[in-house]
Structure formats: structure tokens, C-alpha cells
């Protein structure tokens, strides 16, 4: 299959690197408005550099769109005109209204997916298998200050990863949304089936954190998106008396997780979906709902 990447910033370079390693990719093309950056990357990974998006599309069966969010609508619109399958980096557009308008122009017969990368992190499926009766859920996604400019608030930039997992893998209809924060730091409390769920995201942290924490009826689950480790803390069911204090010793279990690079899983899945004409796991409809929820979060504080 002939694949292209439009946009070779931080994330786009990773798309190029992985596509260049996939046996299912016959040829790889790239385009970026920064011609020098595109040329250097093309030489590094054996990719053909094209002078325009149109030229790239003429030589591609499917493309990744990895340009800044504010340009998604324009660039993806060009892809739709050429009727090429496309993987759009998250968020799908700057606003849910813009995304809905964009998708009205999607032609039939192509695959359209959205790159919510953490959906492909193996800890998500492992935790989903373990959870039985959740009592409390918390997800933290904190970043140190970065020079990378996204044009989005911390909600659409970082928290949207956890929103995507929450809405599409665990709870369909959160309500009673309360949020506190600003463009760079946000905390949200919501009600999911009478379960308190807390999300927090920051672009001002001193430490990078990617945590998933669930208190279940009989155990507590801790998942780390970065190390791809899942730990279960179980109650032994009995207490010991020690120096006039009740002491409970938990039983700790490490869950065996098959570690993978989530982006590689995502891109391999996209290629397979295009080949087999099957829906990509993260649909535009889900991505739009994620954005709508982000907008609710920002409006709730």
C-alpha cells in the first residue's frame, strides 16, 4: 500500500518513522510546508518528498493528517476530494461543529479514523477485563511545560485522551460535570452511573504523569500509561492488631501486560482497516463526541 504523511512536526515524524518500518507499506510519501524539514526526514527514512498535498495524494492510497488542529478541516477536505482514506490526528477538528461540517463532505468508500492513541495502549483492555464494581475512578495526565504550541486548551490537548477512554470504553453517559481550572490546568468531577469520576490534566507540572486509578468493591487498580504496568491491590479480608492499632496488609498483584508502542498498533490497525475496508476502532462520530464533551468541560467552570 502507498501511504502518505501530511505534516512532519513532532507527531508527524513518529508517523513517518513507523510507516517506514511496516512491511505492509510499499511506498511512503511526505509533505510539509517546511520543505527543508520534509527533505531531511525523507532522506532519513527513505520517503519521497512531494511539493504539494495534491501531488502526495495522487501517489497515495491512504494518508495520515498530522498538521496543527486549526488546519485539519482544510487539509482533510482536500483528502476527501481525492477520495483517499485518512487517519486524522486528535482532536478531529478545533470544534465539534467544525468536525460535523467536515464529515458531511466525507465520500463513501473510504476509511476515516481519528488518532486517539491511548485507545491502543494495552493497559486499557487489561483494566477493562479486571474491573467489576467500580466505586471511584481517577485519571491523571500531567505534562511539564513544553515549547510545543498546540493552539488548544489542556482539555483538547491532554485530557481528551482520558475522555476518549472514559466515554468509549467505560461510561457512556457522564453527567453533573463540574470543572475548575484554566487553559493549562484543569480538574473535572463528574457522575458516571453514580460513580464519582475525577479527571485532571496539566501542562505546568514538574513531573510527567499518566495514571489510571480505580477503587473497586474488593480491590484497587493502578495503571500507568507510560510504563504500561497494571497493579492490583487486594484486601486480605482480615485485620491484625498491632500496638493498639488495626493494621491491614494488602496483597499486591502485578498484571502481565503485553507491552507495545501504541502508535505502531494504531497505524498497523489503520492499514489493515483500509485493506479490508473495515471501520477504524476510533470513528469520527466518537471523536466528535469526545470534542463535545471537552466543550462541556470547559463550559462547566
Task: Set out the residue ranges of the language-model regions.
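C-terminal helix-rich "cap/oligomerization" subdomain common to oxidoreductases
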Residues: 62-67, 269-301
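Contiguous beta-strand/loop segments that form the cofactor/metal-binding neighborhood of enzyme cores
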Residues: 160-229, 233, 257-276
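Conserved acidic residues
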Residues: 28, 61, 135
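Mid-domain beta-loop-alpha active-site segment that forms a flexible
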Residues: 115-122, 144-175, 286-287
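N-terminal Rossmann-like dinucleotide-binding module
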Residues: 1-44
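Beta-loop-alpha module in the N-terminal Rossmann-like domain of NAD(P)-dependent dehydrogenases
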Residues: 15, 45-103
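A contiguous active-site-proximal alpha/beta segment in oxidoreductase catalytic domains
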Residues: 93-147
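Hydrophobic residues in well-ordered beta-strands that form the structural core
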Residues: 51, 88-89, 112-114, 223
Amino acid at each position: 500500500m502507498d501511504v502518505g504523511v501530511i505534516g512532519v512536526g513532532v507527531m508527524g515524524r513518529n508517523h513517518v518513522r513507523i510507516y517506514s518500518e511496516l512491511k505492509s507499506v510499499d511506498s511512503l510519501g511526505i509533505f510539509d510546508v517546511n520543505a527543508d524539514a520534509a527533505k531531511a526526514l525523507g532522506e532519513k527514512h527513505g520517503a519521497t518528498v512531494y511539493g504539494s498535498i495534491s501531488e502526495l495524494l495522487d501517489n497515495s492510497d491512504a494518508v495520515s493528517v498530522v498538521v496543527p488542529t486549526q488546519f485539519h478541516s482544510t487539509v482533510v477536505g482536500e483528502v476527501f476530494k481525492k477520495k483517499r482514506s485518512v487517519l486524522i490526528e486528535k482532536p478531529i477538528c478545533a470544534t465539534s461543529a467544525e468536525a460535523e461540517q467536515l464529515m458531511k463532505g466525507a465520500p463513501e468508500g473510504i476509511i476515516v479514523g481519528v488518532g486517539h492513541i491511548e485507545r491502543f495502549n494495552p493497559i486499557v483492555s487489561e483494566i477493562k477485563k479486571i474491573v467489576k464494581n467500580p466505586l471511584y475512578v481517577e485519571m491523571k495526565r500531567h505534562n511539564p511545560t513544553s515549547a510545543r504550541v498546540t493552539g488548544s486548551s489542556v482539555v483538547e490537548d491532554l485530557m481528551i485522551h482520558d475522555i476518549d477512554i472514559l466515554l468509549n470504553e467505560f461510561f457512556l453517559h457522564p453527567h453533573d460535570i463540574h470543572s475548575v481550572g484554566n487553559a493549562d490546568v484543569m480538574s473535572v468531577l463528574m457522575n458516571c452511573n453514580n460513580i464519582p469520576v475525577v479527571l485532571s490534566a496539566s501542562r505546568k507540572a514538574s513531573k510527567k504523569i499518566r495514571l489510571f486509578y480505580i477503587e473497586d468493591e474488593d480491590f484497587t487498580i493502578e495503571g500507568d500509561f507510560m510504563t504500561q504496568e497494571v497493579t492490583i491491590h487486594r484486601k486480605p479480608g482480615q485485620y491484625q492488631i498491632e500496638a493498639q492499632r488495626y493494621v491491614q496488609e494488602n496483597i499486591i498483584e502485578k498484571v502481565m501486560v503485553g507491552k507495545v508502542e501504541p502508535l505502531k498498533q494504531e497505524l498497523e490497525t489503520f492499514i489493515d482497516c483500509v485493506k479490508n475496508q473495515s471501520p477504524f476502532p476510533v470513528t469520527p462520530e466518537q471523536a466528535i463526541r469526545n470534542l463535545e464533551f471537552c466543550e462541556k468541560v470547559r463550559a462547566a467552570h
